[in-house]
Regions:
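Acidic, serine/threonine-rich low-complexity regulatory regions at protein termini
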Residues: 1-295
């Protein structure tokens, strides 16, 4: 017999199993995590690729979760392959379509013709499917991975505490600033290559901490947030520092609603692979299977 009083929702963070799902996501992010070396020869093109993904996602009305997943797949695939200029856009678009097939309704999955203005017109649907398959095989078909956006949605429900609303007339103003600031920091985290090496849950928790600190809420890290995220304030200091630095650069050089920040191609992640495997080369006419990098 159905329980009519139970709330029906597609949002996992609003269900009675949210704590269990969150625990699984934190386990999965560690189990899946690949080492990021910031060693792609095309890393200087990343800001353009991220902006393109976000632009297509906006046109197709995709979620922020889908965008974060697409960029995650693109980052780790690029880090292990040499890509020709006319191929790299195709790869980024394939990452977006794979992310959409996981996170979105089938009607929102973009079609190849939406990219015809930035990729070769000779690319066929058959060839595009081969590129998708190459990406899937590289990740061993494990592409449903947690991202910063997944964790943010859960942590947002625990953002405020009772002491934040001692002036009720400011509650709506505070919540509006909170929503806009969270989106701004999420965009900043998406554009920074320096945050890729951190677990998504840590980046998400750092966004919450940074937002509360920026809004002047005391304490900036509550016992409830510590319990929910599993992180102490001291665990997030370095990540918050990188996030804040990236936001300041973002505001200085790029309008906040525009898109992306060009990160330095010379940056080396604090977690570097002990031995770098030879990257395989992917070309438009020929697709060569690559081995997954050992880590």
């Amino acid at each position: 017999m159905a329980l009519n009083h139970q709330r029906r929702t597609d949002k996992w963070w609003e269900t009675e199993y949210s704590d269990n799902i969150h625990s699984y996501l934190q386990y999965h992010e560690v189990k899946w995590r690949m080492v990021y070396g910031a060693r792609s020869p095309q890393i200087h093109l990343r800001p353009v690729l991220v902006k393109t993904i976000r632009s297509i996602a906006k046109t197709c009305e995709m979620s922020n979760v889908c965008v974060h997943l697409a960029v995650t797949l693109m980052d780790f695939f690029m880090d292990n392959h040499d890509l020709k200029f006319d191929t790299i856009m195709l790869v980024s678009f394939a990452c977006l379509t794979l992310a959409a097939k996981i996170e979105e309704h089938c009607l929102k999955i973009p079609k190849l013709n939406t990219m015809q203005n930035v990729i070769s017109k000779d690319v066929t649907n058959s060839h595009f499917r081969k590129v998708e398959m190459k990406i899937l095989m590289f990740f061993e078909f494990n592409v449903a991975v947690p991202t910063v956006a997944h964790f943010i949605e859960f942590y947002k429900d625990h953002f405020f505490c009772d002491s934040d609303f001692y002036h009720n007339e400011f509650a709506s103003i505070l919540k509006d600033k909170f929503n806009r600031m969270i989106l701004s920091y999420q965009d900043a985290s998406l554009e920074s290559i320096k945050l890729i090496s951190y677990n998504p849950s840590m980046v998400a928790a750092s966004i919450i901490l940074t937002t509360r600190h920026t809004l002047g809420l005391v304490p900036c890290w509550t016992p409830q947030l510590r319990k929910v995220t599993g992180y102490l304030k001291k665990d997030l200091v370095q990540c918050c520092s990188l996030l804040g630095r990236n936001v300041m650069q973002h505001r200085k050089f790029v309008p906040i609603d525009e898109g992306y920040l060009s990160s330095s191609p010379g940056f080396q992640s604090p977690i570097i692979m002990a031995s770098k495997k030879k990257r395989s080369h992917i070309d438009v006419p020929n697709i060569i299977l690559s081995k997954r990098t050992a880590f």
